[in-house]
Amino acid sequence: MVMQPGAAPDGPERTFIETARRAQIARAAIDTIAEVGYAGASFARIAERLGISRGLISYHFAGKDDLIKQGVQEAAEQAIGYIRPRILAESSGPAMLRAYIEANLAFMRDHRSNVIAMIEIARSAEGRRIFDDDTAVLNAVGALENLLSGSQTAHQLRPGFDPHVMAIAIRAAIEAASPLLALDPEFDIDHYASEIATVFDLATRIGDGPTGPEAD
């Protein structure tokens, strides 16, 4: 059979093996970008990393953009799978907010290559946007806003703040850690997470005293 670029079927027709192979290639692409940069992450380089032929990558992906989109999706799903259970394990608004912040930053700590790759994917060396993730940003803000507003409705967080503005501020504080983690070997992301979680606990709480370990 002659394999054509992007010839692997989409949707329900894609087999379990094909889906697993696409995920494997996408993860390897993210790791390769983290190691050699966006420009250096060629199909040949990714194939070498996996010990497969370049043609096999071309069979599963129509081009580099297609592969990178899949890589970003894989990274996002990995993050959701890590973060969501830690939030849902908590039962109060303040505890869920702290878990949200600390889990996001813990995931970044444990998946540093993802952080580096996302920085590379977001911008070229000239600052030109390579991959447009505006929808993902809006979705992240919206989900956090829902958590905050729901906790306000349940009388678990202070009613006087704007949940949309607060969600933007929290996401900005989390994302600010990305370049520091990527570039500064001395950056203590665990300390940063604890401090940021306390800052937003103080900004959103109803009663006196923080909800974190400082209260013990």
What residue ranges belong to the model's regions?
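C-terminal peripheral helix-coil segments that are non-catalytic and often amphipathic
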Residues: 1-9, 106-110, 141-154, 169-216
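Short, structured helix-loop boundary elements
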Residues: 22-23, 43, 65, 69, ...
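Helix-turn-helix
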Residues: 24, 32-66, 70
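Conserved hydrophobic residue
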Residues: 39, 157-158
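Hydrophobic alpha-helical connector segments
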Residues: 70, 81-114, 163, 167-170, ...
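Amphipathic alpha-helical packing segments from all-alpha helical-bundle domains
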Residues: 77-85, 110, 116-117, 128-154, ...
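Amphipathic alpha-helical segments used for helix-helix packing
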Residues: 96, 108-128, 179, 183
